[in-house]
Every structure is written in structure tokens, then in C-alpha cells.
Curated annotation (Swiss-Prot):
Descriptive protein name: UDP-N-acetylglucosamine--N-acetylmuramyl-(pentapeptide) pyrophosphoryl-undecaprenol N-acetylglucosamine transferase
Cell membrane among keywords: yes
GO-annotated molecular function: UDP-N-acetyl-D-glucosamine:N-acetylmuramoyl-L-alanyl-D-glutamyl-meso-2,6-diaminopimelyl-D-alanyl-D-alanine-diphosphoundecaprenol 4-beta-N-acetylglucosaminlytransferase activity; undecaprenyldiphospho-muramoylpentapeptide beta-N-acetylglucosaminyltransferase activity
InterPro entries given in the database record: GlcNAc_MurG, Glyco_trans_28_C, GlycoTrans_28_N
Membrane topology according to the record: Peripheral membrane protein
Pfam family membership, one: Glyco_transf_28
Biological processes annotated in GO: carbohydrate metabolic process; cell division; cell wall organization; lipid glycosylation; peptidoglycan biosynthetic process; regulation of cell shape
Family the entry assigns: Belongs to the glycosyltransferase 28 family. MurG subfamily.
Length: 378
């Protein structure tokens, strides 16, 4: 049974695409066709995204103070809006869901302008610029870490959690069994979907300072930018540490599932996946994130005892080496941290968000949805 088309719009980074992918799987299972609007950056994820069709619509962010750049961006947005209006008119979706990032602006402006029931999903604890620009126009706002008491938009905000992909749910079934003294210790290091330059130097430097008997236990999976990959590999080879280093791992969820400890940034999708899988982590919020959203994302997990959060400026090689040495020596503490992380997870977020999408598509209000689903997003 074909229930119609749901159009998903997401910026082309993992933080936006992954929750959209999770919702797409759920909607497809319920009988909907799913189309994705994104930008060219999303090509690396396209193979696993269960879309009936993927559309690239022109868009741009207006961040420059250069008048010529601003004019170019405005023109690109105008072209994108016209393209998106034609697409929405042609597809006639029953609902449109935006997941943030500037590529979502044209399709959401088009859908709301044409009267199509529309929702935005904000993954972070602090709303991003694209979603802020669209918040007043949409029927509902779904939040990952966004508080339900969302200021002027509290009435239409639902705390759904961040949808996680089937691969993450599969990894969550792997029980956490911490490495014991003398056993191999699996360390997974990544900086979100695009890697992190800081970790490329900081982690090898920290491992270098560890005692030989501890260093010999460590096996590293590390995401590194293409330009950093060779130097990171060389650093680990010099230390005699086994390491798998790559700019992108298509099976990162299963690698997290096999990890004893994770070191990462604290983007919303990362924190959500760590909590659903239930793995101890050292989170280092990206210091230049707009509105410091990564620090806010990590706060709840840290408060629950599910992660250690360290500012990048305070994380010297000596500090990180000490943290790693303690982790290798205290498997019981790692087990407790893993359990605390898992207790905060929301593995059913995709189902809750899909329920909200169906409610809005059927013309029901957010208040009706909250009343019917008492305790959800209240």
C-alpha cells in the first residue's frame, strides 16, 4: 500500500543525513515513498539511504560580509527556491521534514509556501541557523536534545529524540564487555562524519606517553581527514600500535559496538548513537561550533555519568594519556559508564518522529499528538 510521498530535506553532513536516513527506513516500512533533497556532499551516504529518489537543489549560506558573495548566495537561494517549488508541486508530498543545514531552506520555504504540512527536526540542544529561519513557518518542531520548553515555540515542540539508523540499533545489541588486564583494548576515535584534525595529533601523542605494557594492548580505529591520514598512520607505526585509519568508515556503528572506549566530538548524532549503543566515551566538543551546541549536547550524557567531557583547550597529551591509562586499568568503571550512557538512549526515536509526521500529514495538531502520546515531548 502506497501512503504517498514524504519529502526529507537534509544538509549533506552525517549529522543531518543520519537521522533522516533512520526516519526514511521507518517511513518506508510503514508504506510511504521517501524522497531526499540534499546537496552534493551527501553522495558518500547515498548508497545506504533508502530513498526512492534523491534530488539536489541549489542552496547557499549567507555568512560572508563581501557584498558580491552575498549577492551570489541570494541568487543561488532564489534559484533553489524556484527549483524546490517545482519539485514540491510535481511530487505532491503528504509531508515535508527538514533536518537542518542550509540545503533545507529552499524545500521548506517551498513546502510551507504551498501549504504542505511541514516539520523541522533539530538534532542539537541549540537550534541551528537554518532551523531558526524556518521555525515560525512549520507545523511542528521535533527535538533531539532541544528542550520541550522551547521558548516561543514550546507549543509545537516535541522531544522525539534523535532517530538512529538500523546499523546503530544492531550495534546496540552487542553487550559491553570491557577489556581486562592484558587483553586487547579497542579504542575508536572520530570527529563526526568529517574527521577531526585535533585528534590526528593529540591521540598518537597521548599514546606515546603511556607505559609500554599499556600501549601494546591498544588497537586503534581512527577517522582522519584525507590530508592527515598518512601522518597519522606513520605515527602509529612508529609507536608499534595497530591502527586502522581512514577518512570515512561505512561501518562505524559496528566499530563503536566493538569499542572499549570512544574518543570523539559531541555532535548530536554522535552523542545519540553512543547513548543508544551504550559505550563509554571521552567527548571533546568542537570549540568553534556555532552557539556551542556540541557542549550542550554532551552535557546531559555527562550529567548521567555516561561520558567524560573535556574542553579541547584543556586536553593536553599528558591529560589524555592519563585518562587512557585510567581507562585501561579500570574496566569496572568503564562498564558503569557504558550502562549509564545506555540508560539515556532513545532507540525508538525514529518511530516517535514517524508518528509525528503521520499526525501532521493527517491534519492533527501538535497538541492532539501530545495528548494522544502522553509523556512524549511534554
Amino acid at each position: 500500500m502506497n501512503k504517498g510521498i514524504v519529502l526529507l530535506a537534509a544538509g549533506g553532513t552525517g549529522g543531518h543525513v543520519f537521522p533522516a536516513e533512520a526516519l526514511a527506513h521507518t517511513l518506508k516500512a510503514r508504506g510511504y515513498q521517501v524522497h531526499l533533497v540534499t546537496d552534493s556532499r551527501a553522495e558518500r551516504y547515498a548508497g545506504k539511504f533508502p530513498a526512492d529518489e534523491i534530488h539536489v537543489v541549489p542552496s547557499a549560506t549567507i555568512g560572508s560580509k563581501n557584498p558580491i558573495s552575498v549577492v551570489r548566495s541570494l541568487w543561488k537561494l532564489w534559484v533553489g527556491l524556484r527549483t524546490a517549488r517545482r519539485l514540491v508541486t510535481k511530487l505532491k508530498p503528504v509531508a515535508v521534514v527538514g533536518f537542518g543545514g542550509y540545503p533545507t531552506v529552499p524545500p521548506l520555504l517551498a513546502s510551507t509556501g504551498l501549504g504542505v504540512p511541514s516539520i523541522i527536526h533539530e538534532q542539537n540542544a541549540v537550534m541551528g541557523r537554518a532551523n531558526k529561519a524556518l521555525a515560525a513557518r512549520v507545523k511542528a518542531i521535533a527535538g533531539g536534545f532541544l528542550p520541550p520548553a522551547n521558548g516561543q515555540y514550546s507549543e509545537k515542540t516535541v522531544a522525539t529524540g534523535n532517530p538512529v539508523r538500523p546499523a546503530v540499533l544492531a550495534a546496540s545489541e552487542i553487550p559491553y564487555t570491557p577489556s581486562q588486564t592484558g587483553e586487547t583494548f579497542q579504542l575508536v576515535v572520530f570527529g563526526g562524519s568529517q574527521g577531526a584534525q585535533f585528534f590526528s595529533s593529540a591521540v598518537p601523542a597521548a599514546i606515546c606517553l603511556m607505559k609500554d605494557e599499556q600501549r601494546k594492548r591498544i588497537v586503534v580505529t581512527q577517522q582522519a581527514r584525507p590530508e592527515d591520514k598518512d601522518s597519522v598512520i606513520a605515527s602509529y607505526q612508529k609507536l608499534g600500535v595497530k591502527a586502522d585509519v581512514s577518512p570515512f568508515f561505512g561501518d562505524m556503528a559496528s566499530r563503536i559496538g566493538e569499542a572499549d572506549l570512544v574518543i570523539s566530538r559531541s555532535g548530536a548524532s554522535t552523542v545519540s548513537e553512543l547513548s543508544v549503543i551504550g559505550r563509554p566515551s571521552i567527548l571533546v566538543p568542537y570549540p568553534h561550533a556555532l552557539d556551542h551546541d556540541q557542549a550542550a549536547n554532551a552535557a546531559a550524557l555527562s550529567a548521567a555519568g555516561g561520558a567524560s567531557v573535556i574542553k579541547q583547550a584543556e586536553l593536553s597529551p599528558q591529560k589524555l594519556s592519563s585518562l587512557l591509562s585510567s581507562a585501561l586499568a579500570e574496566p569496572d568503571r568503564l562498564s558503569a559508564t557504558a550502562a549509564a550512557a545506555k540508560a539515556t538512549g532513545k532507540p525508538h526515536a525514529a518511530d516517535v518522529l514517524a508518528d509525528l509526521v503521520e499526525a501532521i500529514a493527517e491534519g492533527r495538531s501538535v497538541q492532539e499528538f501530545k495528548k494522544k502520546n502522553e509523556g512524549v515531548g511534554a
